Amino acid sequence: VKRWLLAILAAAALAGCSGVRMAYDNADTFIRWRLLQFLDVNGEQADELDERITRFMGWHRANALPKYARDAEDAAHRLESGLSREDLVWGYDIFIGHGREAMRAAVDQLAPLLDRLTPEQIRHMEQRVAEENRKFAREYLRGSERDRREQRARRIVERLEDWLGNLSKAQIEAVKQFSARAPLIDELRDRDNRRIQGEILALIRAHETWKRLGEKVVSWDKGRDPAYVAARTANVEEFNTMLLEIDRLATREQRARVVAELRRYSAEFRALAARPAS
């Protein structure tokens, strides 16, 4: 549940504005495809899944999109006025808050179906979760420390250039310095993901998702290894320092591009929220 919802939020944040409406119009198809990578359902259960996805999307259109529109406009205003560390903390908190709200709404729809899974269906889910973990290990846990830090820097540069256009040499150097300083947390993140997966699968096996999964997905950070909490905190602080340096080095054109993009997002989200569901 956590991963596919965050994937949707990330896609909305990183997609080109012209693609927001197309992405949202196909979000139900994406969610169904993602869930069917874990759920082995057919017949009436498959029809029920489709109905529950439709209800979730109705909730999201009415409740989440207006907030996204408001916050995108607020972010544009903050950036236009000059980025501060407080602005970055605000943005992070807003993103996490939206994710938790959406996950709780998704659980309200999915839990009744999850509570009726058979032992065979649960074993299928366990196998798929194990495959996801192996994929994560291939993408994030292989290679030397130097290789992984360089790969992290390349990913960040690509994402920043989606927003800013081509980065200057000084901006790229700021990214490299961040990646050299900030702790590598992927092993800790992998262990934490496995902890959360184990807790959620235990609820599914016990047929208690309706009673308890909603609280679990909005408080997934409870029970984290203190070492992971400390590493995440240090990582976020270093990342924010890097973003402030990127902002300090930004050209007028780069800043205007991001502000305009955020305002286009806001307009797109408002239009989608106002449009009748198909």
Residue ranges, per PLM feature:
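Short, low-complexity cationic-aromatic patches
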Residues: 24, 39-47, 100-108, 118, ...
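Extended amphipathic alpha-helical interaction segments
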Residues: 108-223
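Mature extracytoplasmic or organellar-lumen-exposed domains after removal of signal/transit peptides
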Residues: 49, 128-131, 177, 256-261, ...
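A cross-kingdom marker for long, charged
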Residues: 23, 32-33, 190, 197-278
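Alpha-helix N-cap/N′ positions at the starts of helices
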Residues: 30, 105, 152-155, 195, ...
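N-terminal Sec/ER secretory leader and immediately downstream segment
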Residues: 21-120, 124, 128, 262-265
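Sec-dependent signal peptide recognition
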Residues: 2-8
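C-terminal motif of bacterial Sec signal peptides marking the signal peptidase cleavage site
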Residues: 15-16
